[in-house]
Amino acid sequence: MNHIYKLKSYGIGTDRRFYGVANKTLETPDFLDPVRESFDWFLHVGIPEAFDRIFPIVSANGKLEISFRRGSLRVEKPENEYLAIREAKIKGKTYSARVYVTLVKVHSEDGEMEEQEILLAEFPFMTQGGTFIINGFEKVVVSQLIRSPGVCFRENVRNQQADDLFNKVEIIPQLGSWMEIFHKVTGNQVDTVKFRIDKHKNIPLLSFLRAIGFTNETVRKYFGNSPELLESIRRHKLESLEENLELIYRIVRKDDRITEEGLKNLIPSIIFNERRYNLASTGRFMLNAKLNLVERISQTYLAEDLVSKKNKILFKKGTYITRQLALEIQEKFNNEEIPLSEIEGVDSTIYARQLEITRNENLWKRFYVAIVKVWPNKKSMLQESEPVNVIATDPNLNEKTLVLSDIIAIVSYYFNLLSNLGKSDDPDSLVNKRIVSVGELLQNQFLIALTKIEKNSKEKISTKSDLSQLTVKSIINNKPIYNQFKNFFNSSKLSQFMDQINPLGEMASKRKVTSLGPGGLNRDTAQFEVRDVHTTHYGRICPVETPEGQNIGLILNFSVFSRINQYGFIITPYYQVKNRIVDYSKVHWLAASEEFDKSFAQSGVEIDQNNRIIPDKLTVRKNQTYLVLDAEQVNYIDVSSMQMTSISASAIPFLENNDANRALMGSNMQRQAVPLIKSEAPLVATGIEEAVARFSATNLRASISGKVTYVDAKKIIIDDGEKPEIHYLRYFEKSNQETLILQKPTVKVGDKVKKGQLICDGPSTDNGELALGKNVLVAFSTWYGYNYEDAIIISEKLVKDDVFTSIHIQEQTIKFRSTKAGNDILTAEIPNASAKSRLHLDANGIVIVGSEVDTGDILVGRTSPKGEDNPTAEEKLMAAIWGKKALAQKDTSLRVKNGEGGTVIDVQILSRDQGDNLEEGVGMLIKILIAQKRKIKVGDKMAGRHGNKGVVSVILPVEDMPFLEDGTPVDIVLNPQGVPSRMNIGQVLELHLGMVAKKLKTKFVTPVFDGIKIETIKKLFDEANIPESGKFKLFDGISGQAFENPVSVGYMYMLKLLHMVDDKMHARSIGPYSLTTQQPLGGKSQNGGQRFGEMETWALESFGATSVLSELLTYKSDNIQGRNLLYNNIISGGKIPSPGTPESFNVLAYELRGLLIKLEVHKNDQENQEVEEIKDPLELPEIPSNFIDEYNQDGRIELNKLEEFADFDEENIDFDKLTR
């Protein structure tokens, strides 16, 4: 019996059965395009924009000007990207490009001009894969999600200190001071409205309005008579402009002396100066969008006629304004059909001051606003009560700073909210958040550096008396740019070491979005609301993929189809629907703000051949809720069922059947799957695997169309008839996480290829599809308790057949230095080294490539001069004359570290003689790469794709594994108790479908939210002759008896994760101690011990294990003398000493002494068994002298001063003496 399906082709000739509903889905875009486009923007728009902001640089006396010649920018990058990147990785360099620019120097006195092209900067250049190579390591610049510049109105916001609620508006620039207007809405009294600049003290709003030229009459005229405003006017006593300016000056510039010039420039410099206050294009767009009329006049009644320029009544008084009508009215203001009103009654002194600073003549035109008088409701219209003024800003503004009409519109909106006009904003919505991507982050760094260059240049010019001698090159120093970029890439939180375990991890790290970093949130203070999933995330940010732990909800991932528009807002695609007909010809990209009042249907809606929606009623998304509407009311439809999720989450089959918490774990763990020796694509896929493989940077695509003329393990040559193109393959390269990067050709000589076609399989790729794990036969059953608590039982077959074997590459380096005592020598003649350890060295003393080395074997032979022989000049002379024997040498060879044995695959030698750039005092550096084959073993972590993770607890012989009726032994036994409470049913469905796939010798594709339904799986059971329950009779391999009940058995896709026991296993015999506590350090990297804490001590106490406890808390912990004595006695074979006082007890003793508490120490004398009382409280067991010094540095009491207080009289204490 055959259920209806389509056969879809994926990768290189893999056909999969598709049972979904979705009719047409949008082709997945190149996932790395946003990153590349952003860097491209930086090169072609960002850099020239930065130049325009800083240049021309004019000297203080105005005699010299340096300007930038437009269009002269030239970026010079390395010719062959592959070879340049390879060299950068081997030699630890940065893959960078040079920026040349032509600057013009003009001497105003004689009009002399000098033009010169200079090398302005050398900065890291992005690779094709969207990464940067910094000092030989691949790094990624992560996009940042921050509050968008603009204006944000909020009602009833809780104050964190008190329990009061506030109304407030925040004015957020991209550069400059944040401003806030707010008042308290709780309490019995009406509160006055306040204004705040940055985090300074509150200023009455009236003071600010007065300072920019308003009078009380103008304030009432424009902003109405709300109780809060009248109370603010009543309480405000400062009348003149100067008094109000002085008040603001004292708060904002509290340490500066007040001058007349300072008062005049105060507000223009804070708000109106483009160099200090910049909204950027995004801020201006947001301001114009928020401060228009539409939101406030919708669903109100006109309180006056709206008249056109020609005195024609366009809208009559009393008209009810729908949203559609509000849009029409706004449009007429935009087109100036309805004239704007001039701002009257405002003293423009301060504003005129701004014109002097910016010399922007357009600003005189900015004295206009759009004013509409309305009644908020029908009752107020019928009573003809006083109408409310709704003031909108000039709709044609494009200034990057605030202007007067903005300020009036903001204050008007604030008071309109008290009349229930307008709506408050949600700061967590993507309407009010924007993405700062790579290009913009780099432009910000470039701007900071150019500002430093401007400052330095002005200083340089001012110190020179003869300006004619100065050249452009001598004035402009490019060091600040180099330092700024170096700083950013090496130490910024946004420049991260790339996750390179597998192609999925690499892709995810390039599409990561963080709310942390400069200008972002702080993980310690971020509230729950900020971390939560928001309705506007749909199609833009994945609701599933985020880290567990303190970064949850702060680090996110872009959804599959999301992109970023020119303002930095995330946009997502839809198909438009008109009268039930879906228009597939054009894709509409919408930002969150454009979704208001529109209804969106899912992609899985049934559609006929004429693209008409079949069902009459549909569940749709509209204004942040789900509604059931008629099909005619649908405006848009999703382009794909994967639209909501990120790449990792879209790779989980049956995601819709899993609990979100487990899906989150599944997404994160897929990124940790290590590439296996033989990759295998899943039997049950979701369809995104092909796209990941195609766009991954670890796979190669043909750069031209043509014929393959040459193929080997390291390169592929394609000829298009004009010029052969060489494609270099990556061969046995080490990734950032020490996994293997190896590309295998998938084309043969003679094949014809198209541009963009995959020509090789990289790590974790199988025939052009992502392949992170293996399809293995899994049974859900318990087995003698070995899979208790998520443990996993695996068959020895998986070890023998190298099913889960991976290759890992370790790098070991050694430096050869030149010191006063002499030079390090590379040699095969190593003193006191055994022949076995030198077995693999060549004549020069370097290990031979291909050698199998083990722990302790010598990789590079090196001898260094012994430190104590530091010869004087006379001794050197004597040695030269008499030819004394060479100075004593010691063995400092590079040996294989513990647990890092394997096959030597490469030796890289960097030498100063060959022109390599090495650090000071180093003449040569040798890197050895060792490849290790790791089979799966007990203690390794494994997982499925559904968040079902566990640790291998036992590897059973094949004959002991449970087997099916036909004798097939299962590969893995999982605990059935891991399913119900975790609610990740997807793994069970995958198991059954995997069994069907194996029986029918086919493969399935089941995209997220458009997957195979359970009814279909049941019908497929019939087709594959599988019992209806999907369960099989299973037999115990040891007893041969059948299990009591049938067991679910099928094929599941299992991954081996990077958390391997080889990297975790660790034991300490001797090792370092902490300087402060004198206890052993912790962790494998420090060769530390396992902390035996308070609860562990209780456990031993309860068994009365006194001797074990005694040595744990003394010798093995912090009894300094005891452990040294013990070590000596063990070596010399003496008697084990009795445990002494631990150091922590001494700390307690000092603490008590500092509190002047008398201590008595009773010593147990072995000879006469007498107890001796120590009269002097200072006569405690011996304490090391350095310990006292250390504690004194802590500001504790100096012990020698304590003797003065041995017989103290409480009334005559000089307490000052007790402190340092």
UniProtKB/Swiss-Prot annotation:
Fetch the Pfam families from UniProt: RNA_pol_Rpb2_1, RNA_pol_Rpb2_2, RNA_pol_Rpb2_3, RNA_pol_Rpb2_45, RNA_pol_Rpb2_6, RNA_pol_Rpb2_7
Q: What is its EC number?
A: 2.7.7.6
Catalytic activity field? RNA(n) + a ribonucleoside 5'-triphosphate = RNA(n+1) + diphosphate
Per UniProt, the keywords (alphabetical) are: DNA-directed RNA polymerase, Nucleotidyltransferase, Transcription, Transferase
In the record, biological process GO terms are: DNA-templated transcription
Task: List GO molecular-function terms, semicolon-separated.
Answer: DNA binding; DNA-directed RNA polymerase activity; ribonucleoside binding
> Superkingdom of the source?
Bacteria
Q: Which GO terms describe its cellular component?
A: DNA-directed RNA polymerase complex
Purpose: DNA-dependent RNA polymerase catalyzes the transcription of DNA into RNA using the four ribonucleoside triphosphates as substrates.
Q: Which NCBIfam families does the record match to this protein?
A: PRK00405.1 (NF001616)
Q: How does it assemble?
A: The RNAP catalytic core consists of 2 alpha, 1 beta, 1 beta' and 1 omega subunit. When a sigma factor is associated with the core the holoenzyme is formed, which can initiate transcription.
Q: Which family does it belong to?
A: Belongs to the RNA polymerase beta chain family.
- What is the recorded name of this protein? DNA-directed RNA polymerase subunit beta
